[in-house]
């Protein structure tokens, strides 16, 4: 297939937005120049392991970059890691991931694709499952693959190195993960592979295996791991600091309002379709002293419309939030209250006491029983109710005490 492309400089401007690491820019430009000259689209690979059913905004960052390549005329190749998911990516883990069955990964993959369709046109993608080439491998094939790397090389990975130094188990099958991901690149003859910065080791393994197979090494293009609502840890469902693609417009808007001001520009850049020029204007306005809340509300609306909501739904979500929080019901400058994430869920009375919103457990129980405790405006009446709080939620004790949840 041949086609006309926009100029290399025009493509680079689009493709480099939000990129934080690249191996290498020179190679990407060379591949684009050859693509323009020959009319052959680059094959741009993104692999996802369907280890869960629902996507957060954090998952959309590499998906949005894949969309950029597709809109520049290139062939997006989405690898459903139904086989690698049964191993579990050890990246950033202090312990081995639980292994999933093939039935579980198949069901998760279907849900993933349904949600990914909110980010890009999946009908334009070449969708492959790595069980196509990994499942038929014989044991001798696996041994030959294992011979492509060394234990010393694997221990260069920070997560493996840390576990080794702490005496935590590292299972042999975990060493295979980067080799399996690299084999995917060989199988689909990837020109470019996308991933988060935490995937660099795995992406580079693909380059090594492609060289060994006589292929031109892929360019490795990495996007950031964006912080969640707490502004500290990466966005994660397990931490509760996330905005999900399956959230309602009201939930999306409300959660956006809970982010620290320092994340406003980051979220505009990586999670919305707002033009870069407008983002720069917003950044300059905040630097000049304009109220960040104005732009946080704009961000909330933009997130809703970017992921399938209508302008009307975004407007109504803002109106409902304003009615609850801004018209004298809740102050905008709510102090943070720190709660230990490891102790959640926590009984309501202990939440009040630990957050410093009640002087004692007995006073906390009395306040709750009298109807004086709310979480995001919803009354809690049982002092023993187990609360699985998330970052950004607003606690109110009595008439005037407020706290915004931060988990540590």
Swiss-Prot record:
EC id: 6.1.1.1
- Chain positions recorded as ATP binding sites: 237
Q: What compartments host this protein?
A: Cytoplasm
CC annotations in GO? cytosol
Q: Which UniProt keywords apply?
A: Aminoacyl-tRNA synthetase, ATP-binding, Cytoplasm, Ligase, Nucleotide-binding, Protein biosynthesis, RNA-binding
* Listed GO MF terms: ATP binding; RNA binding; tyrosine-tRNA ligase activity
HAMAP family attached here?
A: Tyr_tRNA_synth_type2 (MF_02007)
Protein's name according to its UniProt entry: Tyrosine--tRNA ligase
- Can you name the source organism? Symbiobacterium thermophilum (strain DSM 24528 / JCM 14929 / IAM 14863 / T)
């Amino acid at each position: 297939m041949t086609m006309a492309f926009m100029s290399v400089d025009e493509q680079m401007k689009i493709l480099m937005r939000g990129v934080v690491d690249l191996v290498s820019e020179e190679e990407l430009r060379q591949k684009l120049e050859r693509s323009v000259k020959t009319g052959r689209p680059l094959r741009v690979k993104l692999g996802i392991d369907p280890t869960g059913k629902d996507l957060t905004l954090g998952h959309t960052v590499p998906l949005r970059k894949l969309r950029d390549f597709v809109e520049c005329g290139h062939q997006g190749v989405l690898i459903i890691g139904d086989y690698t998911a049964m191993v579990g990516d050890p990246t950033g883990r202090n312990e081995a991931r639980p292994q999933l069955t093939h039935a579980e990964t198949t069901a998760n993959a279907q849900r993933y694709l349904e949600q990914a369709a909110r980010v890009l046109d999946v009908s334009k993608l070449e969708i492959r499952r790595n069980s196509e080439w990994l499942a038929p491998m014989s044991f001798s094939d696996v041994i030959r693959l294992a011979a492509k790397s060394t234990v010393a090389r694997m221990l260069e990975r920070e997560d493996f190195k840390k576990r080794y130094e702490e005496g935590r188990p590292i299972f042999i099958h975990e060493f295979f993960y980067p080799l399996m991901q690299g084999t995917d690149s060989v199988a689909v003859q990837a020109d470019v592979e996308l991933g988060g910065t935490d995937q660099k080791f795995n992406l580079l393994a693909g380059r090594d295996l492609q060289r060994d197979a006589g292929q031109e090494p892929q360019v490795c293009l990495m996007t950031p791991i964006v912080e969640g609502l707490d502004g500290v840890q990466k966005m994660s469902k397990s931490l509760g600091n996330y905005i999900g693609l399956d959230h309602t417009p009201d939930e999306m808007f409300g959660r956006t309002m809970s982010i620290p001001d320092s994340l406003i520009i980051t979220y505009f850049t990586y999670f919305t379709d707002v033009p870069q020029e407008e983002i720069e204007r917003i950044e300059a306005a905040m630097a000049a002293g304009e109220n960040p809340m104005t732009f946080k509300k704009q961000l909330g609306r933009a997130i809703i419309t970017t992921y399938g909501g209508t302008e009307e739904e975004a407007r109504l979500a803002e109106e409902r939030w304003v009615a609850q929080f801004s018209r004298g019901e809740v102050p905008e400058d709510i102090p943070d209250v720190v709660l230990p994430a490891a102790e959640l869920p926590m009984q309501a009375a202990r939440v009040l006491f630990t957050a410093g919103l009640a002087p004692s457990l007995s006073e906390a129980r009395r306040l709750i029983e009298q109807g004086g405790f709310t979480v995001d405006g919803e009354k809690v009446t049982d002092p023993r109710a187990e609360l699985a709080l998330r970052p950004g939620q607003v606690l109110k004790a009595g008439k005037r005490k407020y706290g915004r949840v931060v988990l540590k």
